[in-house]
Amino acid sequence: RGYGRKTKGFIAASAGSTAAELGDEPMMYHLRFADIQVYVGENRAAALERIFNGSNVPDVVVMDDGYQHRGVDASFKILLTTFNDPFTADYLLPAGGLRESKSGYWRADCIVITGFPDAQDDQERKRWLESIQPLPHQQVFFSKMVYGDAVSFGGKELGSDRTFTNAVAFAGIANPAAFFKQVNSCSENITEISFPDHHNFLRQELVSMVANASDQTTFVTTEKDFVRLKCNGLLDVFQNVRACYIPITIRLNDAP
């Protein structure tokens, strides 16, 4: 869809695309994975028709947030559920966060438990399988978020050990707790600043944040927030300080 973008309609990512045009998450995919095509469009069916009638027809289209999309019947459906808030323990709106009955899980070809704290714990994974009770046609995977080494914004160089004496960790994502925990693990002192999800940073709020910090401070953010800062021309605010983002990858493990 391109949530948070300032445009409408079908757009194919290109060399000149920005987060304002595509949305921050599609823009991040576009920058990180140069060998894939990225498209946004609020009308999924119309967008797919444009893609498959185009000159560069893909073998596979991955549609974000498409499990409950009524206008497109995907040939392979992936259901994500979080370790801390599994659908098996949730309820329908407004009592809980589910948009349909739990029984709707039967449509999934693949179920992924995200944020699994220890993907090597077979006993814990077996307990999850008993809770989900996957059907014969369903595969189950357990995923874990893995943080990479901090990447400098390009101003003052980071220390070779990538640890921080003082850190200001700032993020405009939905659930920043894991990010703050990661920064805390490599910092002696940390100040946490949380913004709303998909927040469009204002130059003045960033200037104030930098001005109020000590000379020993390192500013740390997420890769998604870095993309917004870069596309909005705000990286110059950090040119005379140490600033970096922490990339993530997702590790998948099969069910036991």
Predicted segments with their positions:
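Short, polar loop motifs at secondary-structure junctions
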Residues: R1-G2, D65-Q68, P176, E223-V227
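Phosphate/Mg2+-binding loops and adjacent switch elements
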Residues: G2-L135
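Hydrophobic residues at beta-strand termini and immediately following loops
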Residues: Y39, T81, S143, I193, ...
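Short beta->alpha linker loops
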Residues: E42-R44, M145, A174, K224
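C-terminal accessory "lid"/substrate-recognition subdomains
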Residues: P86-T218
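Short active-site-adjacent structural elements
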Residues: A178, F201-R203, V227-N232, L252-A255
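Short, flexible loop segments at boundaries between secondary-structure elements
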Residues: P196-N200, F238-P256
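Phosphate-bearing ligand-interacting subdomains
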Residues: V210-G233
